[in-house]
Amino acid sequence: MLLPKRTKYRKMQKGRSPGLSYRGNNVVFGEYGLMALEPSWISSRQIEAARRAITNYVKRGGKVWIRIFPDKPVTRKPAETRMGGGKGSVDHWVAVVKPGRIMFELAGVREDVAHEALRRAAQKLPIKCKVIDREEQGTMAKPEEVSSESE
């Protein structure tokens, strides 16, 4: 599971996530990428599940890059606890993802294998995603959507 080695502050406010992603929205390392089409928090468990889905499908071939990192702590108070008494303890870590963000990249495999591996990774994530090639970058309009809600 991914989490920071150390942070300046233990707890963080929720914050807001308006607009599109202006950073990390190009396929840089690999040939194919998985682009987020919705804003969301992606937990470290979901990132790990998607990574396992990709590596399990491509077997030994290919290289995978994880372009997001869970650096935001999410706190939770124990069950059946009354209001007040301060903020709860850190429960898990999330990565804040905006639309247009490339979350995973893949190289060294055939196009059909890469598309299927990234489609399987998209099934593990709580948002709609789009598989893109390095050539078709910057196309947020009319996406060929891969939804995790289907099936």
Curated annotation (Swiss-Prot):
UniProt cross-references to HAMAP family, sorted A to Z: Ribosomal_uL16 (MF_01342)
Disulfide bridge positions per record: none
Lineage: Bacteria, Bacillati, Chloroflexota, Chloroflexia, Chloroflexales
Gene Ontology CC: cytosolic large ribosomal subunit
Family: Belongs to the universal ribosomal protein uL16 family.
GO BP terms: translation
UniProt KW keywords: Ribonucleoprotein, Ribosomal protein, RNA-binding, rRNA-binding, tRNA-binding
Role this protein plays: Binds 23S rRNA and is also seen to make contacts with the A and possibly P site tRNAs.
Organism of derivation: Chloroflexus aurantiacus (strain ATCC 29366 / DSM 635 / J-10-fl)
Alphabetical list of Gene3D superfamilies matching this protein: Ribosomal protein L10e/L16
Quaternary structure note: Part of the 50S ribosomal subunit.
GO MF terms held by the record: rRNA binding; structural constituent of ribosome; tRNA binding
CDD domains per UniProt: Ribosomal_L16_L10e (cd01433)
Protein name per the record: Large ribosomal subunit protein uL16
Pfam families, A to Z: Ribosomal_L16
InterPro entries: Ribosomal_uL16, Ribosomal_uL16_bact-type, Ribosomal_uL16_CS, Ribosomal_uL16_dom, Ribosomal_uL16_sf
